[in-house]
Every structure is written in C-alpha cells, then in structure tokens.
Amino acid sequence: QQRAADGERPATLLELFDLIKSSGKPVRLNLETKLTPESGAATPDPLTFARLVVDAVRASGMAERVTVQSFDWRTLRHVHTLAPEIGTACLTIESENFDTVRRKTGAPSPWHAGGNLADHAGSLPKLVHASGCRTWSMFWRNLTQADLAEARTLRLTVLPWTVNDPAEMARLIDWGVDGIITDYPNRLRDVMTEKKLPLP
C-alpha cells in the first residue's frame, strides 16, 4: 500500500516512463486523463490534454505499452486521431452518486464526446465501439453477462474496475473478463493462483 511522505512530489509522466524502462520489466501502463466536461479553465482543453499525453508517450517510445483511459471521451477521441497506435479505453459508471452514461435522459451524455446511447439501441458496448475505443472499462457492479457477451461480439476488451473483493474477482474471472483493475494486485494474484491461472 502507498504511504505518504512529506515533501515528496508526484513524478512527471516522462520520469515515470524512464523509471519503468530502467527496470527492464515489460510493464504496461493504463494512463487516465483526469478531465471532466465541467472542468472549464481548471485543466487544459481536451485537445491540448491529449497532445501532452501523446507527445510524452511518443518521446519515450512507450506507445506499445500504454493505454489511455478516461471517463471524458473527448480526450480519447483526440488521442485516437493524433496517435492511432496508442490504445484507448472508455471508462463508464452508472451509480446514484456518479453517472457518466445518463441512460435515463435519452440525450447524449456530456461525457461521451457527442455519442448518444439512443443511437445504439441503448447498448453501451455498441456506443463504446462506435467511439473508437477497443477497451471498455466499467464500474464492476454495472457489468452484466449480457453486456459482456455483446462486448465479445464487438471484439472489445473488457476490464471492470475497481474490484477489491476476492470473491468478486473470482466471479468475474469465471465470467471471462479480460482483466481486472484493482487496488490490491496481491489479492488478485492469490485468486489467480487458486484458479491455476498464469501470473503476469
């Protein structure tokens, strides 16, 4: 687990890339752009944000080891246009306190870069696919077996987040998800070991 250390500052993206390359290990990175449709002047605009990420990834030669994910799909659209060699993952959540899908409104969600769920018969996997993402990463409680099956027909990689309970990890592995995002990789490794799955 992380521990706070007074006086420490977060590493820059380039510093992180250098550290990973110096390790000699085949580490992959899932980079999340922390942007919202309501960010306003508090953050760079989506195109500038995407350019900054793409420039850092390319400068470090890390394109094959990076996926860029976001709830705000505007940055993902720009990343896809600027650097189609960099993978993108569409994040979604439908909960009482945070809902990027806005299924009940019937209108396009501001999180989805103009994409409208209604144009895809209410299918979130189809909307993700139409957006250009090849990975769909949803709040784990929102994933259904029907959605997973539909995502499979669209050849989407399915990565639920953030799964910290070993029983839920086991259930989702049995369903056939492609991977799991967790705060506790040691727990996931234990579940994988129990299931005799190869460890990364």
Model region roles, listed by residue range:
Residues 1-96, 108-120, 129-140, 152-154:
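Metal-dependent phosphodiesterase/phospholipase catalytic core, i.e.
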